[in-house]
């Protein structure tokens, strides 16, 4: 079987190049070169013996027609000019496998070597997309509504008149209604409070009375200094407190008794108790230096006599 197939392949290759294409020059019953080689040898004087012609296979005839060789080449060419274009006949496909020996096997279907299909995720139609968007919008609106309702419940305030007396004679329709305060009013109230807190402080001459009524001592000190209190490590706190007090008195021109007392209370509130004795000593020296001379010195010094150093002993 393998030898016959090899012979057929050699014949196919030999027919690729034809010597003559003119039908007049071709013999009536052509014989292939391979058949001539296999035919028995005869003498020139003897009669020529004719070899029985073998029937050509359909595969061989198809190869001859494809390569344009043989008897049917020219009439086909003549007919094709006037006839419509015909599609070539389908040839059987073969697949080769090497398993020690070459042999022909049947055609392998695509299903055996078919690659696994991949999952195709369709984007969906426009209707599905619209439905999804509507669902998302509804869920978001519900969340917003729940949050806003919770906030509004916190903002509700019942406005009930104090003069009305609720008796059992009043029906449910006559009861005062619960009203809601809009958020804008709340925001305005917050803004007004912030503007009042950020308003500029009064002048230093009015600080003594204004600070005592409204602000703690720490805030009064910050307003008087118009700056920020600085933390400083000092080896001699007495001299440092004395120098800082003198600078503030000279810069702000604080020569009134109320202003000086406010300055002392601010220093005491901003510092720890262990520094109170040094603060009072420094302030007492400044007080004596300012009000020791003159007729009003005794009266002003008596007002400061209530402050005693024993009250500010170190802890």
UniProtKB/Swiss-Prot annotation:
Location in the cell: Nucleus
Cellular component GO terms held in the UniProt record: nucleus
GO BP, sorted A to Z: negative regulation of DNA-templated transcription
Domain (OVATE): residue spans on this chain: 230-289
Keywords of the record: Nucleus, Repressor, Transcription, Transcription regulation
Source taxon at top rank: Eukaryota
Entries under PROSITE patterns matching the protein: OVATE
Compositional bias of kind Polar residues: 160-174
Tissue: Expressed in roots, shoots, stems, flower buds and siliques.
This protein's record includes keyword Transcription regulation: yes
Region of interest: Disordered: 113-183
InterPro entries on file: Ovate, Ovate_C
UniProt cross-references to NCBIfam families, sorted A to Z: A_thal_3678
Note: Plants over-expressing OFP7 show kidney-shaped cotyledons, round and curled leaves, small rosette size, late flowering, reduced fertilization and round seeds.
Name of the protein in its database record: Transcription repressor OFP7
Organism: Arabidopsis thaliana (Mouse-ear cress)
Gene: OFP7
């Amino acid at each position: 079987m393998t030898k016959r197939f090899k012979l057929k392949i050699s014949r196919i290759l030999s027919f690729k190049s034809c010597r003559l294409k003119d039908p007049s020059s071709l013999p009536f019953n052509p014989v292939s070169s391979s058949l001539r080689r296999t035919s028995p040898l005869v003498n020139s004087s003897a009669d020529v013996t004719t070899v029985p012609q073998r029937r050509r296979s359909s595969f061989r005839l198809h190869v001859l027609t494809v390569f344009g060789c043989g008897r049917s080449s020219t009439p086909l060419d003549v007919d094709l000019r006037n006839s419509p274009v015909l599609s070539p006949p389908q040839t059987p496909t073969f697949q080769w496998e090497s398993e020690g020996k070459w042999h022909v096997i049947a055609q392998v279907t695509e299903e055996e070597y078919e690659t696994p299909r991949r999952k195709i995720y369709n984007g969906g139609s426009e209707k599905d997309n619209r439905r999804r968007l509507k669902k998302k919008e509804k869920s978001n609106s519900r969340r917003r509504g729940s949050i806003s309702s919770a906030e509004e419940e916190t903002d509700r305030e019942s406005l009930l008149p104090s003069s009305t007396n609720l008796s059992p004679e009043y029906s449910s329709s006559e009861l005062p209604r619960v009203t809601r305060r809009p958020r804008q009013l709340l925001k305005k109230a917050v803004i007004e409070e912030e503007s009042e807190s950020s308003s500029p402080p009064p002048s230093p001459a009015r600080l003594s009375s204004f600070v005592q009524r409204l602000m703690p001592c720490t805030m009064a000190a910050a307003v008087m200094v118009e700056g920020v209190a600085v933390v400083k490590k000092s080896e001699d706190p007495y001299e440092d407190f004395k120098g800082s007090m003198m600078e503030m008195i000279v810069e702000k021109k604080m020569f009134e008794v109320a202003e000086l007392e406010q300055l002392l209370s601010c220093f005491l509130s901003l510092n720890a108790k262990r520094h109170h004795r040094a603060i009072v000593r420094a302030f007492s020296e400044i007080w004596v230096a300012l009000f020791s001379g003159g007729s009003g010195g005794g009266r002003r010094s008596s007002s400061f006599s209530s402050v005693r150093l024993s009250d500010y002993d170190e802890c």
